[in-house]
């Protein structure tokens, strides 16, 4: 107590004057006014507290129980100043808008075009921050899309529009309290502080909207074209089989040794099949040996058998020319006239049914004319007599 009985008044030591104007101008509260610091003397008379603008005036009273101690109040002020330093942007990153939105209440703010100047992007990751402050959009609905800009320098001037309804309350809540669950953890994010004029501040880490790839775009895998594979040269040999002869067998072999496949209708009687007695063909009979051989076999026909002979099995190259085919047709009708009526009809039918299959083989083997024989006969004897292999 003083000598005159009045309580002692202690003046607070001067604060540090090295604060930036930004730290001094950022505040909390919705009344948009900066109350002056005032001195409050408690009823005890021995405590002097300097009250700043961190708490509304209605929270103070003259009782010691409701008053925060001086040390705790100073600690709280230091914590708040540290939070303000974290949320304060450097001077070079802040671009003031060219238009100040109207200070009317909600629903009266229209669209404003804010030009944003973008400097050199030093970090490889640029943040695209397009924030639409609409009336139905909460703080949780603000998304930040990051893209890789590499080492390129982006110096465009971009304008974007947005409805600034309800921007003052939303931005103050998002930037003033760092411990809220809605605060983003992106290091280079767009921080917005709304002073009394409602201005929006955007950082310089802003990439043009054209560089953002659309999220709905999907990667399309190109399937290689497999139709360009070279086709193999396949030689097709059509063996036409008569419908009246279901027992006739046809085969196609890819072996180089089995070059030619010929189907012969061999008709043997039961007695000749048992005795294995046949007249051999000599060189003189080789000119029309095919016709004579077929005539002798069909003379005493009892039953017919379909036999398939290949070049490897019989060791013969069976080659038919067009001239020999015509000769067989003509001679078959002439030489079978002396036979009985039943056998003549059967022998002529056998020759005429089998000739289409032989003709088709001749047509498909035109490119192998060097292997064809002359008009000397149907068979070219290689090693053995044909009678040794006939069944």
UniProtKB/Swiss-Prot annotation:
GO terms for cellular component: acrosomal vesicle; mitochondrial inner membrane; motile cilium; sperm principal piece. Residues 1-23, 90-110, 152-221, 271-299, 330-351 are annotated as: Disordered. The modification Phosphoserine is found at residues 253, 269, 314, 347, 357, 372, 376. Induction: Down-regulated by Busulfan. Its main location: cytoplasm. Residues 90-101 have a biased composition (Low complexity). Detected only in testis. Expressed from stages X to VIII of the seminiferous epithelial cycle. Expressed from step 13 to step 16 of spermatid development (at protein level). The keyword Phosphoprotein applies. Keywords: Calcium, Cell projection, Cilium, Cytoplasm, Cytoplasmic vesicle, Flagellum, Membrane, Mitochondrion, Mitochondrion inner membrane, Phosphoprotein. InterPro entries: Ca-bd_spermatid. Pfam families: CABS1 (PF15367). It is found in: Cytoplasm; Mitochondrion inner membrane; Cell projection, Cilium, Flagellum; Cytoplasmic vesicle, Secretory vesicle, Acrosome. Transmembrane segments: none annotated. Calcium-binding protein. Essential for maintaining the structural integrity of the sperm flagella. This is Calcium-binding and spermatid-specific protein 1. It comes from Mus musculus (Mouse). The gene is Cabs1.
């Amino acid at each position: 107590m003083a000598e005159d009985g009045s309580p002692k008044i202690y003046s607070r030591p001067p604060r540090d004057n090295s604060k930036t104007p930004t730290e001094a101008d950022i505040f909390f509260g919705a009344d948009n006014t900066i109350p002056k610091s005032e001195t409050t003397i408690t009823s005890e008379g021995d405590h002097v507290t300097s009250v700043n603008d961190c708490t509304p005036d209605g929270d103070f009273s003259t009782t010691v129980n409701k008053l925060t101690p001086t040390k705790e109040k100073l600690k709280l002020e230091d914590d708040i100043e540290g939070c303000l330093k974290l949320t304060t942007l450097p001077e070079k990153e802040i671009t003031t808008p060219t238009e100040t939105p109207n200070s009317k209440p909600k629903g009266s703010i229209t669209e404003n075009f804010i030009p944003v100047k973008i400097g050199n992007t030093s970090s490889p990751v640029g943040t695209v921050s397009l924030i639409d402050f609409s009336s139905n959009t909460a703080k949780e609905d603000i998304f930040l899309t990051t893209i890789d800009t590499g080492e390129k320098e982006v110096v465009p001037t971009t304008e974007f529009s947005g409805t600034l309804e309800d921007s003052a309350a939303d931005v103050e809540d998002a930037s003033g309290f760092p411990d809220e669950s809605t605060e983003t953890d992106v290091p280079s994010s767009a921080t917005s502080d709304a002073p009394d004029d409602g201005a929006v501040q955007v950082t310089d880490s802003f990439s043009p909207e054209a560089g953002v790839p659309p999220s709905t775009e999907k990667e399309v895998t190109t399937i290689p074209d497999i139709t360009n594979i070279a086709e193999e040269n396949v030689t097709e040999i059509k063996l036409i089989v008569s419908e009246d002869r279901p027992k006739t067998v046809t085969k196609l072999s890819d072996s180089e040794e089995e070059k030619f496949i010929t189907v012969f209708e061999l008709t043997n009687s039961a007695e000749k099949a048992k005795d294995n007695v046949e007249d051999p063909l000599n060189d003189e009979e080789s000119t029309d040996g095919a016709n004579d051989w077929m005539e002798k076999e069909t003379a005493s026909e009892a039953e017919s058998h379909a036999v398939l002979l290949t070049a490897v099995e019989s060791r013969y190259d069976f080659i038919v020319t067009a001239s020999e085919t015509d000769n067989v047709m003509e001679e078959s009708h002439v030489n079978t006239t002396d036979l009985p009526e039943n056998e003549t009809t059967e022998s002529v039918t056998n020759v005429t049914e089998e000739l289409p299959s032989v003709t088709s083989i001749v047509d498909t083997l035109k490119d192998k004319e060097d292997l064809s024989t002359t008009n000397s006969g149907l068979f070219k004897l290689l090693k053995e007599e044909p009678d040794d292999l006939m069944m």
